[in-house]
From Swiss-Prot:
Disulfide bonds join C174-C217. The keyword Transmembrane helix does not apply. One of its GO terms (biological process) is defense response to bacterium. It holds the Pfam family LBP_BPI_CETP. Belongs to the BPI/LBP/Plunc superfamily. Plunc family. It comes from the Eukaryota. Residues 1-18 form the signal peptide. The gene is BPIFA2. Glycans are attached at N124, N132. This is BPI fold-containing family A member 2.
Amino acid sequence: MLQLWKLVLLCGVLTGTSESLLDNLGNDLSNVVDKLEPVLHEGLETVDNTLKGILEKLKVDLGVLQKSSAWQLAKQKAQEAEKLLNNVISKLLPTNTDIFGLKISNSLILDVKAEPIDDGKGLNLSFPVTANVTVAGPIIGQIINLKASLDLLTAVTIETDPQTHQPVAVLGECASDPTSISLSLLDKHSQIINKFVNSVINTLKSTVSSLLQKEICPLIRIFIHSLDVNVIQQVVDNPQHKTQLQTLI
């Protein structure tokens, strides 16, 4: 059981550290967003206003964005803040990441899928994500390479800014879909390693899901906020969105 003094210390450290990290990260990401916006509008052809055309453009935008140096900078800033905070926590509380030596690399958003919200005022968004995962087996002493895939879910609605009276895109909570997470071995391994992975698969899924959510969700937020609000509004207002979405997804 965690001693009381450690709990008090943890709360104090996290309060001060998290405030500082959030301030620094906010300033860094604010600068990054300014760099991302021109990337979205550079070298892209004009598309029609049908839902299919708009969603295809979003997919192209997302692909271009992830290859840009600005996106890599945003990912780096988010990872630095998360790593610093985890270092503070790990000194007091052991985590599954420490126990398994788990590392995430080459995370990639593959697609963007949309479905209308029932009230017709927004969209439910799904972002399929893949990543490479390495695990250092504490018992077997070998590095295990895995491929992870999952869906990150969020929703976006169009609301009126009370100060400017202009439409703005408001993004809801971003979280992983627990039913979508899958892990697969990349290489052939012995029966011992297969048994080890199977014995801890639920713990690994939970940890990988949490890490990818923390890394990618801030970038999804940047991506949505970098879009022209009119593009999102067109998707929301399209009267044939249900039929066309089903053909895309």
